[in-house]
């Protein structure tokens, strides 16, 4: 039964460039050990006579009929937006500042 040491948790945090507090390290150590135990239990149950599967229910992609339709005009498309200018949607700035 593999367990994650504090040093391994710190190393994982360093690899992810995440600064972890002592409390977070302790919590993650417990959580990752529970996950590892769960994976080990599944591996114990899995046997050679059970075929591997990604999904127990076979799913088929539903494709709608490929029918040519008239696209929206620019005016129709812009009518769905709250604010437009010069034929484009106007959205609030989220990065940087105006210079």
Curated annotation (Swiss-Prot):
It comes from the Bacteria. The gene is gatC. It holds the Pfam family GatC. It is an enzyme of class 6 (ligase). Its EC number is 6.3.5.-. NCBIfam families: gatC. Heterotrimer of A, B and C subunits. InterPro entries: Asp/Glu-ADT_sf_sub_c, GatC. Belongs to the GatC family. GO terms for biological process: glutaminyl-tRNAGln biosynthesis via transamidation; regulation of translational fidelity; translation. Allows the formation of correctly charged Asn-tRNA(Asn) or Gln-tRNA(Gln) through the transamidation of misacylated Asp-tRNA(Asn) or Glu-tRNA(Gln) in organisms which lack either or both of asparaginyl-tRNA or glutaminyl-tRNA synthetases. The reaction takes place in the presence of glutamine and ATP through an activated phospho-Asp-tRNA(Asn) or phospho-Glu-tRNA(Gln). One of its GO terms (molecular function) is ATP binding. It catalyses: L-glutamyl-tRNA(Gln) + L-glutamine + ATP + H2O = L-glutaminyl-tRNA(Gln) + L-glutamate + ADP + phosphate + H(+); L-aspartyl-tRNA(Asn) + L-glutamine + ATP + H2O = L-asparaginyl-tRNA(Asn) + L-glutamate + ADP + phosphate + 2 H(+). This is Aspartyl/glutamyl-tRNA(Asn/Gln) amidotransferase subunit C. The keyword Chaperone does not apply. Keywords: ATP-binding, Ligase, Nucleotide-binding, Protein biosynthesis. SUPFAM superfamilies: Glu-tRNAGln amidotransferase C subunit.
